[in-house]
Amino acid sequence: MRIIGVISDTHGLLRPEALAALEGSELILHAGDVGDVRILDALERIAPVHAVYGNTDWGEVRQRLPRTVEVDLGSVDGAAASGTPAGPIAHVHHGDRELDLDPAAAGIVLVVSGHTHRPLVEERGGVLYLNPGSAGPRRFTLPATVARVRVGDEGKLEAEIVALP
């Protein structure tokens, strides 16, 4: 079983509790509003990171990151493989309205987004939709959260939201 850490909306704040919750991940996905490239560097010390920029990311963060990314959850570093992927494919983008494809038709089994700060785990049409919530400054009386996705041997996905103290 493989563990994928998922984080979003750090807005320049990487809590020690978020790092602790992501420890043990073999791959980390960041769904935007990173706030500072040093956050990506800190996450890279845990596992390879695939991230997208969000609507509040500018400068070096926006230059360094794509708007969307597809990640092979079965490969060692998550790199999108040419040819047959090693495992299930995840599509990562920031805003929930940025999805411009039919995930099931594209062979995508996990869609990760951020932006709303509201955690969400929902399966629709064979696709798991995940918003890890916000790990950054608290807003809208919502808790600070991250998520973990377990990838089973058969490619089965199980997601959980982890509330940060």
Task: Tell me the role of every PLM-derived stretch.
Residues M1-V49, D57-R67, A86, L142-T145:
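N-terminal active-site segment of His-dependent metallophosphoesterases
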Residues D96-R124:
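Non-DNA-binding regulatory cores of transcription-related proteins
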Residues V6-S8, L27-D33, H50-N55, H91-H94, ...:
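Active-site neighborhood of phospho(di)ester-bond hydrolases with catalytic His/Asp-centered motifs
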Residues E70-T84, A106-G107, E123, L130-P165:
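Binuclear metal-dependent phosphoesterase catalytic core
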Residues R15-A20, I39-A42, A80, E98-D102, ...:
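Short, flexible, glycine/charge-rich loop motifs used to bind or transfer phosphoryl groups or to couple energy/partner
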Residues H11-G12, R97-E98, A135, L164:
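Residue-level signature for short turns and capping positions that connect secondary-structure elements
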